Amino acid sequence: MFSDERTVGVAVLGLGNVGSEVVRIIEGSADDLAARIGAPLMLRGIGVRRVAVDRGVPVDLLTDNIEELVSRADVDIVVEVMGPVELSRKAILSALEHGKSVVTANKALLAASTGELAQAAESAHVDLYFEAAVAGAIPVIRPLTQSLAGDTVLRVAGIVNGTTNYILSAMDSTGADYDSALAGARALGYAEADPTADVEGHDAAAKAAILASIAFHTRVTADDVYREGITKITPADFVSARALGCTIKLLFICERITAADGQQRVSARVYPALVPMSHPLATVSGAFNAVVVEAEAAGRLMFYGQGAGGAPTASAVTGDLVMAARNRVLGSRGPKESKYAQLPMETIGFISTRYYVSMNVADKPGVLSGVAAEFAKREVSIAEVRQEGVVDDGGRRVGARIVVVTHGATDAALSETVDALADLDVVQGVTSVLRLEGISL
């Protein structure tokens, strides 16, 4: 039902970078949006924590009473861009219960509670849209739920965190170490004061959970996603990567796997990996994002663009708002959520990939054969070995660095090998263990 036959009432929760841009678009593009929707949008109110703060909008639109705002009879659609998970969850559930369609960009909430929110929307016969939650302005949710609805998605992978991609791109192009590249990202506003969620892979894991759930029609939460961060990557790793014709990216990978018993499983993981320069993802630099979808009939599709920031994210939010508003005008709903099967998750130990292992060792005869023996004991086949001298600040040779590239091996076998290498007297330390993706096993 319409609150008014001539308008679609909108409430915006949150007036940060994204919320401010959404309000600007609603007001600045009012005529264009009305033409696309079939009725004008009317901004009914904006939920904020502190009404007294000057925010550059009419004060009579501001309220700190979120519950009252989302239950108003003249509000048809609630746009949630607040951030805090529990506060957002309560507001969205309340809005849905009051018959409001909801647009949200809250990836952390969706990664934990997509099922709960989707069921609430279904029960209330309203829409729940969240295109902006995964990759900012990049359209990937709608292609998965609509364009590929008749296909079988086999794999979804890519780069969905602009902060880490900027840091790794800077390390690759300038030779900077991690701390220097992080400082540069902070100076440009790409990294938060506390970058943990980005650099330890939490942000990418939440997005991977959302995409895996949609792509494979199963419930995946952020806790189901195996995760590693980028804080241990060194300039030496980039030197070795370039020698191998690769660069290093923080990837998310979600894929459908058929286990030995014939049962289908889902693997979802986030980690830094070597990517061949010939792969499309290797060219995604700076704060840009990209998602590659592989489907049975459609083949490989790639989506690229700005994955974060106020304006790009607001673009996706407003796109969802237009879709929800059109449905209100027509008295219809968007596509219903698929019926979900609870496919089991594949543990990381059974996932087979190629590996890059770097270690500092004593510079003496027999070391290489001892290292190779540890790989052989666990049936981890070596594809390539590189050895170089290590010198101190005075140019005196003080040891050697060995880089081993393997053929396909399970994570479990490789982990056992690394533990054994660390126990060898001649190994001073295993400095890096990275996977190689986009390379045939």
From Swiss-Prot:
Reaction catalysed by this enzyme: L-homoserine + NADP(+) = L-aspartate 4-semialdehyde + NADPH + H(+); L-homoserine + NAD(+) = L-aspartate 4-semialdehyde + NADH + H(+)
Query: Which is an annotated Pfam family here?
Result: NAD_binding_3
Q: Specify the ACT domain's residue ranges.
A: 356-435
Record-level Gene Ontology MF annotations? homoserine dehydrogenase activity; metal ion binding; NAD+ binding; NADP binding
Q: One biological process GO term for this chain?
A: threonine biosynthetic process
EC code: 1.1.1.3
The record's keywords, sorted A to Z, are: Amino-acid biosynthesis, Metal-binding, Methionine biosynthesis, NAD, NADP, Oxidoreductase, Sodium, Threonine biosynthesis
Q: Which residues bind L-homoserine?
A: 192, 203
* Annotated pathway: Amino-acid biosynthesis; L-methionine biosynthesis via de novo pathway; L-homoserine from L-aspartate: step 3/3; Amino-acid biosynthesis; L-threonine biosynthesis; L-threonine from L-aspartate: step 3/5
Give cofactor(s), names only.
a metal cation
The cofactor remark states:
A sodium ion is seen in the structure; a metal ion may subtly affect the relative position of the nucleotide-binding region to influence enzyme activity, and could increase the stability of the enzyme.
- Which amino acids does the record list as binding NADPH? 18, 49, 107, 309
List, from the UniProt record, the residues annotated as the active site of this protein: 207 (proton donor)
Which residues are listed for NAD(+) binding in this entry? 18, 47, 309
Q: State where Na(+) binds.
A: 131, 134, 136, 138
**What is the protein's known function?**
Catalyzes the conversion of L-aspartate-beta-semialdehyde (L-Asa) to L-homoserine (L-Hse), the third step in the biosynthesis of threonine and methionine from aspartate.
* NCBIfam families registered for this protein in UniProt: PRK06349.1
Q: Which family does it belong to?
A: Belongs to the homoserine dehydrogenase family.
Name the record gives this protein: Homoserine dehydrogenase
> From which source organism is this entry?
Mycobacterium leprae (strain TN)
Q: What gene name is given for the protein in this entry?
A: hom
